[in-house]
């Protein structure tokens, strides 16, 4: 799974 925060 991948987590992206911007």
Swiss-Prot record:
One of its GO terms (molecular function) is dextransucrase activity. Its EC number is 2.4.1.5. It catalyses: [(1->6)-alpha-D-glucosyl](n) + sucrose = [(1->6)-alpha-D-glucosyl](n+1) + D-fructose. Optimum temperature is 35 degrees Celsius. Optimum pH is 5.0. Keywords: Glycosyltransferase, Transferase. Synthesizes water-soluble glucans (alpha 1,6-glucose). Involved in the production of dextran, an extracellular glucan polymer. Belongs to the glycosyl hydrolase 70 family. This is Dextransucrase. It comes from Leuconostoc mesenteroides.
């Amino acid at each position: 799974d991948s987590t992206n925060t911007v």
